[in-house]
């Protein structure tokens, strides 16, 4: 009986040590937002997914024109932003001059859920 107990203890130690010295490699996980950053979303302002603070670098956009853009999303193509109702001629000129800084991707629930694109809570 003692021999059986010793064999069982030794076997348990061997199995345990094999698992200890042979760790599993970490699995790389890529979430939806990381995947979107590999597209134009990471380099340009996405009209369907960006929040209002990303328009601060564009002269004349923050906060009024940027909020109009966000409230009228989603867009199918970048040029659709020129068709926002109620834009002044000056706002249309600013949009036209900066069309190359925008992109349009599919709306992602991870980025627009909670309707916080106007106030994302970043202070």
Curated annotation (Swiss-Prot):
**Localization per Swiss-Prot or TrEMBL:** Cellular thylakoid membrane
Task: Supply the InterPro entries for this chain.
Answer: PSII_PsbU
Question: Which GO cellular component term is one of those annotated?
Answer: plasma membrane-derived thylakoid membrane
What highest taxon heads this organism's lineage? Answer: Bacteria
Signal sequence interval, chain numbering: 1-28
Question: Which keywords accompany this UniProt record?
Answer: Electron transport, Membrane, Photosynthesis, Photosystem II, Signal, Thylakoid, Transport
This protein's major location comes to membrane
Keyword Repressor in record: no
Q: Which GO terms describe its biological process?
A: photosynthesis; photosystem II stabilization
Q: Which Pfam families match?
A: PsbU (PF06514)
* Membrane-related topology note: Peripheral membrane protein
The keyword Transcription is annotated on this UniProt entry: no
Q: What does this protein do?
A: One of the extrinsic, lumenal subunits of photosystem II (PSII). PSII is a light-driven water plastoquinone oxidoreductase, using light energy to abstract electrons from H(2)O, generating a proton gradient subsequently used for ATP formation. The extrinsic proteins stabilize the structure of photosystem II oxygen-evolving complex (OEC), the ion environment of oxygen evolution and protect the OEC against heat-induced inactivation.
Q: Which family does it belong to?
A: Belongs to the PsbU family.
Describe the protein's quaternary organization and the partners it interacts with: PSII is composed of 1 copy each of membrane proteins PsbA, PsbB, PsbC, PsbD, PsbE, PsbF, PsbH, PsbI, PsbJ, PsbK, PsbL, PsbM, PsbT, PsbX, PsbY, PsbZ, Psb30/Ycf12, peripheral proteins PsbO, CyanoQ (PsbQ), PsbU, PsbV and a large number of cofactors. It forms dimeric complexes.
Q: What is this protein called?
A: Photosystem II extrinsic protein U
Task: Tell me which species this is from.
Answer: Gloeothece citriformis (strain PCC 7424) (Cyanothece sp. (strain PCC 7424))
Gene that specifies this protein: psbU
């Amino acid at each position: 009986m003692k021999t059986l107990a010793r064999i069982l203890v030794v076997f348990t130690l061997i199995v345990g040590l094999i698992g200890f010295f042979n760790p599993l490699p970490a699995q790389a996980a890529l979430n939806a937002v990381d995947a979107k950053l590999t597209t134009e979303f990471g380099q340009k302002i996405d009209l369907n997914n960006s929040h209002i603070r990303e328009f601060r670098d564009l002269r004349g956009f923050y906060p009024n024109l940027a909020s109009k853009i966000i409230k009228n999303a989603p867009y199918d193509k970048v040029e659709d932003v020129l068709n926002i109702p109620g834009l002044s001629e000056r706002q249309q000129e600013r949009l036209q001059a900066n069309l190359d800084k925008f992109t349009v991707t599919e709306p992602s629930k991870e980025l627009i859920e909670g309707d916080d694109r106007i106030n994302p809570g970043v202070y």
